[in-house]
């Protein structure tokens, strides 16, 4: 059920059964089920054992030239967490095991480095310490953290009326949510959100979040924050650029409607749309 109240998935089995790709599928539904289960396994079987979060990359040969075996990614973990929720609801993994995994994730995130309530893009999955994404990108990443929190809020809603362990999980997520200081990332009260802040480099990354790209979720969450909300002008003047986000471009005869950053005439990459 949509609110997670029906425990239809509480059955034995720790791994979605996807052994061996079938030579053919009886119908599209069977094929899509197989794909969904297989993708779920990246987050279920491939997760960092200590944190439960998604690795930035998995090398099947076990060789990591950049010594990044334990690096987990916050945004990618958000997508994976949404997948776990779907897996629980569809019975690919048991509700009990799913809650245990999600509890591990949330407990880890509560102890990991945060910067005004916001996580870094990369985290050491063993220690919870920030792994710099770039020379000056060693602090809070509002975009990646918003991808993460968007899925955590889905988890909160799914389990908030469950058993005691599930209610505790939902409550701990709510605490992390209320500690995210979206207002801090206005960089001194500007009418725009900023992508990064570092305790070592401050605002040196200097990346205001202006549309259109994959970052709309930051404004949705910022506007709805019960503790650190942003004003409407932040969206209208920052993200929507006081109307400057509109576009009249028609690549291949199709109207873009929105001005795509860096690709105003042709349109940006497709991932911008599903990310937020």
Q: What do these predicted regions represent?
A:
Residues 2-4, 16-69, 116-118, 122-123, ...:
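Low-complexity, Ser/Thr/Pro/Gly-enriched N-terminal "stalk/linker" regions
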Residues 50-57, 92-98, 161-171:
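Surface-exposed patches in mature extracellular/periplasmic domains of secreted proteins
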Residues 29-44, 81, 99-110, 149, ...:
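Hydrophobic core segments within long, regular secondary-structure runs in both alpha-
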Residues 29-35, 116-145, 161-276:
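Extended ligand-binding clefts on enzyme/binding-domain cores
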Residues 1-11:
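Signal peptide processing junction and immediate N-terminal pro/mature segment
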Residues 69-78, 82-138:
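Membrane helical hairpin/interfacial module
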Residues 18-31, 41-42, 78-93, 108, ...:
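Well-ordered alpha-helical scaffold segments within catalytic/enzyme domains
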Residues 45-47, 53-58, 83-86, 114, ...:
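Short, solvent-exposed loop/turn and secondary-structure capping segments
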């Amino acid at each position: 059920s949509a609110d997670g109240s029906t425990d239809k998935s509480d059955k034995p089995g720790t791994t979605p059964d996807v052994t061996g790709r079938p030579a053919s599928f009886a119908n599209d539904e069977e094929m899509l089920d197989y794909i969904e289960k297989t993708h779920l396994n990246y987050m279920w079987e491939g997760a960092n054992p200590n944190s439960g979060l998604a690795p930035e990359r998995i090398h099947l040969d076990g060789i990591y030239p950049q010594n990044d075996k334990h690096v987990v990614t916050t945004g990618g973990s958000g997508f994976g967490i949404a997948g776990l929720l779907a897996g629980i609801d569809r019975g690919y993994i048991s509700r009990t095991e799913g809650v245990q995994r999600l509890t591990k994730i949330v407990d880890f995130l509560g102890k990991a480095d945060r910067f005004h309530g916001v996580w870094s893009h990369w985290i050491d999955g063993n220690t919870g310490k920030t792994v710099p994404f770039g020379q000056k990108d060693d602090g809070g990443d509002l975009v990646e953290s918003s991808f993460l929190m968007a899925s955590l809020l889905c988890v909160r809603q799914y389990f908030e009326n469950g058993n005691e362990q599930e209610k505790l999980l939902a409550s701990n997520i709510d605490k992390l949510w209320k500690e995210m200081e979206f207002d801090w990332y206005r960089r001194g009260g500007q009418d725009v959100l900023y992508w990064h802040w570092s305790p070592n480099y401050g605002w040196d990354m200097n990346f205001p979040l202006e549309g259109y790209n994959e970052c709309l979720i930051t404004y949705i969450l910022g506007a709805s924050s019960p503790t650190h909300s942003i004003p409407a002008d932040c969206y209208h003047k920052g993200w929507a650029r006081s109307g400057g986000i509109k576009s009249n471009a028609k690549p291949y005869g199709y109207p873009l409607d929105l001005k795509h950053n860096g690709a105003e005439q042709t349109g940006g990459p497709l991932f911008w749309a599903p990310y937020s």
